[in-house]
Amino acid sequence: MAFLMKKKKFKFQTTFTLEELTAVPFVNGVLFCKVRLLDGGDFVSLSSREEVQENCVRWRKRFTFVCKMSANPATGLLDPCVFRVSVRKELKGGKAYSKLGFADLNLAEFAGSGSTVRCCLLEGYDTKNTRQDNSILKVTIGMFLLSGDPCFKTPPSTAKSISIPGQDSSLQLTCKGGGTSSGGSSTNSLTGSRPPKARPTILSSGLPEEPDQNLSSPEEVFHSGHSRNSSYASQQSKISGYSTEHSRSSSLSDLTHRRNTSTSSSASGGLGMTVEGPEGSEREHRPPEKPPRPPRPLHLSDRSFRRKKDSVESHPTWVDDTRIDADAIVEKIVQSQDFTDGSNTEDSNLRLFVSRDGSATLSGIQLATRVSSGVYEPVVIESH
């Protein structure tokens, strides 16, 4: 039984990419990283030395190595395998360095997961005297199984998800397609589509109550009794015991015309009734019907705007009582003016004449003979 307690051995081909370090608290400087395996191997390497630009350092350095891991034979859970990334800063022209911080990554969490991107905060070496900076290290880890049992378990991930403000997890789609469940209702609320039409409910009297929806035009209301779906009417007539088309046509007969209800009743499959006699007996045998509702507006905002406008027009306010009516003032001014033609014939046909010596005169028809003799010359003044 000793072989059952022996731990399982695994080998993984690991690809570690050192991407970048953001939020660096330095304006300038040269940074580099030292990476090494604390467990499962003796891999040690250094990255390139890069300058700080806009509080960010980008290495894009890729490391490839083999990592050994073990797992519990009873549970198959992989043991921790720590990989440390140490960030350092050059001093004295590269002759010395100072340790800024480090990040420990458990490679067992990434076993067999392909390529995974992870961002982690740097931890300070001396937590008492050195302030921990808020620099964020971004790495990419890819691990592929080389040898060992492919049936193993990875430890729970230590990564913490960051919730973005303004987004609710309940707004996610829970189902696909047009269903009538809660997922369908959430889909309708996201896409902005109309909810499904509600079916009419059955009253205690046995007649179906129509939902709060009407046709858009009076012509459709007039022809609705003629073009109603017989299958839908037959379903309602089987439940209530009364023809839906007959009830609709009888309610419209008072407003439009008298209709033969025996044809519609036989088409709907319900109780057929023939109406004969005067209108008085017809109203006695008919159940009380609600008058047809007015056409429903397209948008609720139009209804509220119309209701608000009607209420303002029907109820005069104090401002309307004290305000001067501009139309009345304009009408009063127009009535006080005299628009009759008071022009005299003597003032008409006036002309300006200028003689050769520079003298000018105004005259009417009397000076026309003198113009022809050449004493005066007419002057034409264009209107602008």
From Swiss-Prot:
Family: Belongs to the EEIG family.
Region (Required for interaction with TNFRSF11A/RANK): 129-138
Biased composition regions of type Basic and acidic residues, renumbered to the chain: 280-292, 299-315
Disulphide bonds in the chain: none
Name the UniProt record assigns to this protein: Early estrogen-induced gene 1 protein
Location within or outside the cell: Nucleus; Cytoplasm; Membrane raft
GO BP annotations listed: positive regulation of osteoclast differentiation
Presence of the UniProt keyword Glycoprotein in the record: no
Organism, as annotated: Homo sapiens (Human)
Region (Disordered) residue spans: 173-315
Taxonomy, superkingdom: Eukaryota
Record keywords: Cytoplasm, Membrane, Nucleus
Gene Ontology CC annotations of this record: cytoplasm; membrane raft; nucleus
Residues annotated as domain C2 NT-type: 2-145
Biased composition regions of type Low complexity, renumbered to the chain: 183-193
Keyword Nucleus: yes
Gene induction: By 17-beta-estradiol but also by a group of natural and synthetic estrogens as well as by estrogenic environmental compounds. Repressed by the antiestrogen 4-hydroxy-tamoxifen.
Residue stretches of biased makeup (Polar residues): 227-254
Subunit structure: Part of a complex composed of EEIG1, TNFRSF11A/RANK, PLCG2, GAB2, TEC and BTK; complex formation increases in the presence of TNFSF11/RANKL. Interacts with PRDM1/BLIMP1; following TNFSF11/RANKL stimulation in bone marrow-derived macrophages, the interaction promotes the binding of PRDM1/BLIMP1 to the gene promoter of IRF8.
Function: Key component of TNFSF11/RANKL- and TNF-induced osteoclastogenesis pathways, thereby mediates bone resorption in pathological bone loss conditions. Required for TNFSF11/RANKL-induced osteoclastogenesis via its interaction with TNFRSF11A/RANK, thereby facilitates the downsteam transcription of NFATC1 and activation of PLCG2. Facilitates recruitment of the transcriptional repressor PRDM1/BLIMP1 to the promoter of the anti-osteoclastogenesis gene IRF8, thereby resulting in transcription of osteoclast differentiation factors. May play a role in estrogen action.
